[in-house]
Amino acid sequence: VRSIYDITRMFLENSPLCSEFSAEKREHVSLAAIMHDVGKISIPDAILNKPGRLTPEEFEIMKTHTTQGAQLLERIPQMRELPFFTYACDIAKFHHERWDGRGYPEGRTGDDIPLWAQIVSIADVYDALVSPRCYKKAFSFEKALAMIVGGECGVFNPEILACFQDIEGRLRNIYSSSSEQVHE
């Protein structure tokens, strides 16, 4: 969770798309990013922790974590009072959308995807690639960079992708203190 905050923060501080964001807005978006996967609490553990590839049916269930997350946040009255509420709902719902419309849950394209969700999208993919999971070892930083830039993980906003390439070397520092990192 901390890495998503840090990666998002680094994007917000370095992307020309976010140059007019106030320090307060950058902090609110970074805090909201932490809740990107809150909807996974609605996904059965057998699917979340499955050591192998998900079946098409399981993947359809997994995809619901986006809408489930936004709905969960909207149902908590205290959340509505927080300054990052709208960002959190947008990020939870749209962080799996892709620039070319091949994401989910709505298949949005381009700037129809909220900017903060676009940023968390690439941050989440990078974190998932370079971190070990129950179903895979961590990829090397170099391999993760090549996969993202090469389009293996979907199509991202070209300006966000350019920022990612500029800051990727510094993103590695976020993981340098983790003793769990075992890169393949």
Residues of each region from the PLM?
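Metal-dependent catalytic cores of enzymes that make or break cyclic nucleotides
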Residues: 1-184
